[in-house]
Amino acid sequence: MLLRLDPKADQALQIAALGHDIDRADELRKVRRADYDDYDEFKAAHARNGAKILRSTLAKCGVAGSIADEACRLVTLHEVGGDPHSDLLRDADSISFFEVNMPLYYQREGRDETMRRCIWGYGRLSGRLKKIVKKITYEDETLTQLLKNAIQQACLKD
């Protein structure tokens, strides 16, 4: 997804895009949603943990320190952005949820949690990507309608 948004993304940004959710692959070290009352606190802890795990992995692979430092900085910020590179990573991650992950998320988490996640995810999109997400449809019309409802609710919050 990152390279669709910026075909010239540098190496650190590409590494961050590939590794931003690395903590989810380790059952023993991953951050669990159930341990947090606040979703944003959970996401911040997930981002910090992912950066920590990625740093260790990159060191073992011999990645140059400056590239590893930037990749880990970006992973730490991938949920919130804050500068052009981390904003781009956040956008790539966000649009990927809607284009790729939402149907599986719906199967795993159910309607209410998917609605909540869609509202949250839509709210963090840049204006450019909000226009793209508004055009997304799914084979399952239930999901298309859920997304439309989530967008309406997210717009009411703004």
Predicted regions and their residues:
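An active-site-proximal "capping" alpha-helix that borders the catalytic cofactor pocket
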Residues: 1, 44-61
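Divalent metal-dependent phosphate-bond-processing catalytic cores, especially two-metal-ion Mg2+/Mn2+ enzymes
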Residues: 1-10, 19, 63, 78-158
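His-Asp-centered metal-binding catalytic motifs of divalent-metal-dependent phosphohydrolases/nucleases
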Residues: 10-35, 50, 54, 72-79, ...
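Hydrophobic alpha-helical segments
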Residues: 13-14, 44-51, 89, 118
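Short histidine-centered catalytic/ligand-binding loop motif
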Residues: 36-43
